[in-house]
Curated annotation (Swiss-Prot):
This is ATP synthase subunit 9, mitochondrial. It is found in: Mitochondrion membrane. It comes from Schizosaccharomyces pombe (strain 972 / ATCC 24843). One of its GO terms (cellular component) is proton-transporting two-sector ATPase complex, proton-transporting domain. HAMAP family: ATP_synth_c_bact. Belongs to the ATPase C chain family. Its main location: mitochondrion.
Length: 74
């Protein structure tokens, strides 16, 4: 019974990973849109997009780490 609850909790914790995937897609789609509108600001937009990517990916990895902790922690 406890093992089943761990698997359910880990599955729910991985929902954040899908949110991170959507967030990364939005970041880079807006980067492409902004670069096509004004190519001269590409370096600034790219650095901001990489920062947003890193923060979004960190959130997704945190959710994945939490899922592994739920499953394998004693």
């Amino acid at each position: 019974m406890i093992q089943a609850a761990k698997y359910i909790g880990a599955g729910l914790a991985t929902i954040g990973v899908s949110g991170a995937g959507v967030g990364i897609g939005l970041i880079f789609s807006n980067l492409i849109s902004g670069t096509s509108r004004n190519p001269s600001v590409r370096p600034h937009l790219f650095s901001m997009a990489i920062l947003g990517f890193a923060l979004t990916e960190a959130t997704g990895l945190f959710c994945l780490m939490l899922a592994f902790l739920i499953i394998y922690a004693a």
